[in-house]
Structure formats: structure tokens, C-alpha cells
């Protein structure tokens, strides 16, 4: 995730049958290339369950579901306490600039 960008994401129905944004994976690419129609939610999600479970157990990124927004890659990795302090300082700075 840390090395991903918004261009690495897409909105797809391949995983669940409902449109959702995630990182492009081999699984999504393969399913989207099928000529058959995908199943509606929740059937598509249920049918892909065993594969997703096996991929999680094997830590196989090609078949993992990696839901992600367009802000992927913009996060800052730090301890939670440091994050709260940083966000509080940023909010205070923005508030003082606005008021």
C-alpha cells in the first residue's frame, strides 16, 4: 500500500458484485477480462470467498482484496500517539489561519 498511487486503484464489481474502489490485482484483472457477466451482490462476494480466504492465508497479493481510496500512498506511518499529536497541531494551525 505504501508504494501505491491513485492510478493503481480502480472501481470494480469483480470482488463483490457492487462497485467499490481497490488496488488493481491479478484477481481483478482476470475477473474483469471474463466475457461472462458477473454475479450480483452478494453472490459474487460469496463465490469469491474461498479464494480470498486462501489468498489471505498465503499472503498472496495477487489474489488479496485490497480496498483502497484514491488517497492510497498519501498516508504517514507513525505510532498512534504521534499521529494524534500531529493531527491536532495541523488542525490548530488551519483553524488559526481561518479565524
Residue spans of the language-model regions?
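Conserved active-site-proximal phosphate/metal-binding subdomains
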Residues: 1-99
Amino acid at each position: 500500500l505504501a508504494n501505491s498511487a491513485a492510478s493503481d486503484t480502480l472501481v470494480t464489481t469483480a470482488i463483490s458484485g457492487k462497485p467499490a474502489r481497490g488496488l488493481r490485482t491479478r484477481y481483478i484483472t482476470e475477473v474483469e477480462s471474463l466475457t461472462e457477466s458477473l454475479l450480483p451482490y452478494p453472490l459474487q462476494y460469496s463465490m469469491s470467498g474461498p479464494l480470498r480466504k486462501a489468498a489471505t492465508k498465503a499472503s498472496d497479493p495477487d489474489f488479496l482484496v485490497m480496498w483502497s481510496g484514491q488517497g492510497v500512498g498519501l498516508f504517514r506511518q507513525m505510532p498512534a500517539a504521534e499521529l494524534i499529536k500531529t493531527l491536532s497541531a495541523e488542525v490548530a494551525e488551519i483553524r488559526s489561519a481561518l479565524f
